[in-house]
């Protein structure tokens, strides 16, 4: 059995690829030119070089596959470089789903996010996730959408973003706070409350459990 994985070199994708291999399923990965080194078990995978906006590469990736898993999303956008979640998360998943439907692929799995919503004043990341969900639901595919919360676990190199590391880089280093104290972050909109540090819950999931 073969399963196409779009976004298989990313953080969650690397773990999902490992799980497919462990279950004797051959992953066929769509890999951007120059990113082949991010494939952790290349001898156990079939690799197609190309981008998600290249229909021919997408078709080659899904050819003779029983299912496709779409994982692409950008933690940080660079609009000036054309790197946006509208393009890669929403439009990309929409394109892949439409091609999958034409090719007769049986199953489509989309990794969305717990906070996916259409709020125009909210996160563009979550907006794109919501639009992706709607695009998949509007097809005739046998689809499954999963909505994990924040993922954590070993990023295993490759420049893969991981929640705890990003929290340290993007937040802890931005405020003058003693490193030996717990970081109080109950609400980033109402300020910091040192008295309540450590008393707030986060709903997180290890990448291996996705």
Language-model regions, residue ranges each:
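Oxidoreductase cofactor-interface core, primarily capturing Rossmann-like NAD(P)-dependent enzymes
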Residues: 23, 118-210
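Rossmann-fold NAD(P)-dependent oxidoreductase module
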Residues: 15-19, 99, 135
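Conserved cofactor-binding/catalytic machinery of classical short-chain dehydrogenase/reductase
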Residues: 54, 92-95, 107, 131-132, ...
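Conserved glycine-rich Rossmann-like NAD(P)H-binding loop of the short-chain dehydrogenase/reductase
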Residues: 25-32
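N-terminal Rossmann NAD(P)H-binding glycine-rich loop of SDR-like oxidoreductase domains
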Residues: 3-23
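SDR active-site strand-loop-helix element
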Residues: 6, 30, 71-72, 108-114, ...
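Residues forming the Rossmann-fold NAD(P)(H) cofactor-binding site
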Residues: 13-15, 90, 130
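NAD(P)H-binding glycine-rich loop region in Rossmannoid oxidoreductase-like domains
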Residues: 35-41, 45-102, 114-121
């Amino acid at each position: 059995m073969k399963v196409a994985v779009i976004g298989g070199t990313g953080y969650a994708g690397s773990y999902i690829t490992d799980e497919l291999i462990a279950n004797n399923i051959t992953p066929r990965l769509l890999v951007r030119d120059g990113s082949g080194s991010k494939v952790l078990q290349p001898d156990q995978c079939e690799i197609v070089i190309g981008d998600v906006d290249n229909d021919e590469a997408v078709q080659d990736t899904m050819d003779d596959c029983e299912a496709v898993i779409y994982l692409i999303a950008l933690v940080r956008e660079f609009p000036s470089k054309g790197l946006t979640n509208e393009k890669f998360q929403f439009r990309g998943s929409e394109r892949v789903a439409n091609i999958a439907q034409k090719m007769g692929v049986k199953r489509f799995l989309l990794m969305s996010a717990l906070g996916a919503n259409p709020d125009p004043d909210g996160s563009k990341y979550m907006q794109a996730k919501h639009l992706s969900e709607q695009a998949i639901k509007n097809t005739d595919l046998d689809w499954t959408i999963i909505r994990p919360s924040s993922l954590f676990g070993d990023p295993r190199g490759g420049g893969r973003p991981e929640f705890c590391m990003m929290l340290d880089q993007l937040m802890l280093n931005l405020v003058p706070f003693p490193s030996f104290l717990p970081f109080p972050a109950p609400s980033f909109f109402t300020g910091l409350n040192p008295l309540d540090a450590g008393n707030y819950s986060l709903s997180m999931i290890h990448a291996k459990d996705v």
